[in-house]
C-alpha cells in the first residue's frame, strides 16, 4: 500500500516537473517598439495579449526612449528580437548593416502575392524587388492653424503691409511678389503667405506677450530634419536633388528657413528649448503657436479624442483648422516681381515599418503575428482611435473611417489627400539615408539656428540663374 502511494506521488511529481519544464519552455517573442503611452497600452492590452492567448506564447514588448535609439537597442539587447517598429528615415540603415530578413527569404510567391494584394504602397519598402519592410502606418505632415488668429492677421494686413515689404526688400530686392493679395483660404497659401501671417503675429500683443507664433520641431533629431527635406520637395526638388544636396530646390529650402529665423517669424523657443511634437501641442494651448506642420498622431494629441487618456491641449477645438501643405516657391523674385521658381504642395510620405531582424528565432510565427496586428479588426479599431491612415486595401474602401464629420475623420481625409498629392515622393531607399539626413540636420543648425548665413549676419542672395478650411 505504501509502495502504491509512493509510486503515485512520484508520478504526480514527475508530471508536475514535466509541466513546469514545458511552461518554462513556452515560446517567446520580443518586440521592440516606440509608441506613445496610449498607443502602447492599446497595443499590449488589446492586441498582444490576445495573440498570446491564441498561440500559447509569451510576448515581451520593449520600448525605445526615442526614435534615434532604436537601432542601438536592436544591436545590443540581450534578447533575440523578433519584430521591430522602425521609422522610414532609419529603415535603410538596418538593411545596409544586414540586420533585416527580407520577406523573400521565407515566403513563396503565393504568400507574397497575398501580401502585395492586402497592403498598400508596399513598394516603399522594396529595393531591387526585394521586400524588406512590412507596413505599420503611413503618415505625412499637414498644415494646422488657429482659425481666429488667421482672421485677426487677415484684418491687420493693411496695417503691416509696408513693414513686410520693407524687410523682404532687404532680402529679394523687391518685397512681396507683384500684385500680392493675402488669400483668406489657407488652401491657396504659399510660403509668402506664411511669412505674412508670421510677421503680423510677431507684432501683435496677445495675452500680454509679443512674440513670433509659427513653429516646427526644433530638437536636434531626425524629426526636425524632415522639415528641411519636405521643403526641398515643396520647392520642386526630387530624390536626385535631395541626395545631391545641391541645386535651386535645396537653396530655396534653406533660404526660407533662414528668412523665417532672420525676420522673427519662428518662435525662438523651438530652437532654444529644442521642441519636439509635444512642445508644439503645448504651444498651441499656451498661445505660443498659431501655425505648424503636424503628423496625424500630432493632430490626435493636439485636439484630443476623450478616450485612451488623450484629452487634447486645445480648449476650443472648433478654432483648429487643418488643410494641405502650403505651396513651395523661391524667396527670390524675377525682375518683374514674380516668384522666380514656383513649387508644389507635395512633400514626402513617410511613416513606420515593421521589420523582422536577423535575430528572429521563428520567422513564420513572427509573420503570423504581423498579420494579426494588421488584421482588419485591429486596424479598424486602431485607426479610428489614433487617426492612423490604414495600410490595408480593404479598410481604405470601408466608410467607417471616413463617413462621419468628427475630428478623426477630418484628420484622415486631409492627410490622405496630402499623401495622394505627394504621389511617389518618399525618402530614398539609400543605404546611407541616416548619414544624409544628419548632414541636413547639422546644416540647418549651423546655417539657420546659429545664424551662420553670412559674415554680416544677413541672408545671402544666392543667384542660381483637399478642401481646405476657408476662413
Q: Which stretches of residues belong to each language-model region?
A:
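Conserved N-terminal structural module of periplasmic/extracytoplasmic solute-binding proteins
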Residues: 21-96, 111, 157-169, 452, ...
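Pocket-flanking alpha-helical
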Residues: 67-102, 114-133, 192-208, 281-283, ...
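Hinge/lid segment of periplasmic solute-binding proteins
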Residues: 88-144, 151-157, 321-325, 331-341
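Short, solvent-exposed loop/beta-turn-alpha elements that line the ligand-binding surface or hinge
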Residues: 105-116, 177-180, 184, 233-255, ...
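Extracytoplasmic/periplasmic solute-binding protein
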Residues: 130-136, 141, 167-243
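Glycine-centered hinge/linker elements that transmit conformational signals in sensory
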Residues: 195-201, 223-231, 235-285, 325
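Extracytoplasmic/periplasmic substrate-recognition and gating elements
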Residues: 265, 311-394
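Long, aromatic- and glycine/proline-rich binding clefts that accommodate carbohydrate-like moieties
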Residues: 334-340, 348, 383-449
Amino acid at each position: 500500500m505504501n509502495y502504491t502511494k509512493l509510486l503515485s506521488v512520484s508520478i504526480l511529481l514527475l508530471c508536475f516537473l514535466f509541466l513546469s519544464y514545458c511552461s518554462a519552455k513556452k515560446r517567446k517573442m520580443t518586440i521592440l517598439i516606440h509608441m506613445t503611452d496610449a498607443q502602447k497600452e492599446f497595443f499590449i492590452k488589446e492586441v498582444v495579449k490576445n495573440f498570446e492567448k491564441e498561440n500559447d506564447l509569451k510576448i515581451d514588448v520593449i520600448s525605445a526612449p526615442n526614435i534615434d535609439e532604436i537601432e542601438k537597442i536592436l544591436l545590443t539587447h540581450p534578447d533575440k528580437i523578433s519584430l521591430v517598429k522602425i521609422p522610414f528615415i532609419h529603415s535603410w540603415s538596418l538593411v545596409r548593416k544586414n540586420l533585416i530578413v527580407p520577406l523573400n527569404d521565407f515566403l513563396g510567391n503565393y504568400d507574397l502575392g497575398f501580401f502585395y494584394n492586402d497592403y498598400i504602397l508596399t513598394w516603399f519598402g522594396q529595393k531591387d524587388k526585394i521586400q524588406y519592410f512590412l507596413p505599420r502606418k503611413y503618415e505625412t505632415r499637414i498644415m494646422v492653424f488657429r482659425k481666429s488668429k488667421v482672421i485677426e492677421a487677415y484684418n491687420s494686413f493693411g496695417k503691416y503691409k509696408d513693414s513686410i515689404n520693407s524687410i523682404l526688400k532687404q532680402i529679394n530686392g523687391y518685397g512681396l511678389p507683384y500684385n500680392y493679395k493675402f488669400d483668406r483660404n489657407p488652401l491657396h497659401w504659399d510660403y509668402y503667405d506664411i511669412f505674412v501671417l508670421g510677421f503680423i503675429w510677431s507684432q501683435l500683443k496677445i495675452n500680454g506677450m509679443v512674440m513670433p507664433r509659427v513653429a516646427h520641431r526644433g530638437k536636434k533629431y531626425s524629426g526636425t530634419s524632415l522639415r528641411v527635406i519636405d521643403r526641398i520637395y515643396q520647392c520642386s526638388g526630387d530624390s536626385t536633388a535631395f541626395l545631391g544636396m545641391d541645386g535651386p530646390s535645396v537653396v530655396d529650402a534653406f533660404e526660407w528657413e533662414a528668412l523665417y529665423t532672420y525676420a522673427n517669424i519662428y518662435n525662438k523657443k523651438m530652437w532654444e528649448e529644442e521642441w519636439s511634437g509635444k512642445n508644439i501641442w503645448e504651444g498651441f494651448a499656451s498661445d505660443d503657436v498659431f501655425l505648424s506642420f503636424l503628423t496625424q498622431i500630432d493632430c490626435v494629441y493636439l485636439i484630443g479624442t476623450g478616450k485612451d487618456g488623450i484629452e487634447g491641449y486645445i480648449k476650443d477645438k472648433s478654432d483648429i483648422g487643418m488643410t494641405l501643405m502650403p505651396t513651395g516657391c523661391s524667396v527670390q523674385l524675377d525682375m518683374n516681381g514674380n516668384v522666380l521658381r514656383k513649387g508644389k504642395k507635395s512633400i514626402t510620405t513617410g511613416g513606420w515599418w515593421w521589420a523582422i531582424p536577423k535575430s528572429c528565432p521563428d520567422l513564420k510565427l513572427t509573420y503570423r503575428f504581423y498579420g494579426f496586428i494588421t488584421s482588419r479588426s485591429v486596424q479598424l479599431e486602431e485607426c479610428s482611435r489614433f487617426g492612423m491612415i490604414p495600410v490595408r486595401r480593404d479598410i481604405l474602401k470601408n466608410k467607417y473611417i471616413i463617413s462621419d464629420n468628427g475630428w478623426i475623420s477630418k484628420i484622415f481625409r486631409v492627410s490622405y489627400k496630402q499623401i495622394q498629392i505627394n504621389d511617389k515622393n518618399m525618402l530614398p531607399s539609400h543605404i546611407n539615408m541616416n548619414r544624409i539626413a544628419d548632414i541636413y540636420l547639422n546644416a540647418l543648425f549651423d546655417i539657420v539656428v546659429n545664424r551662420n548665413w553670412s559674415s554680416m549676419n544677413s541672408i545671402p542672395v544666392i543667384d542660381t540663374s483637399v478642401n481646405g478650411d476657408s476662413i
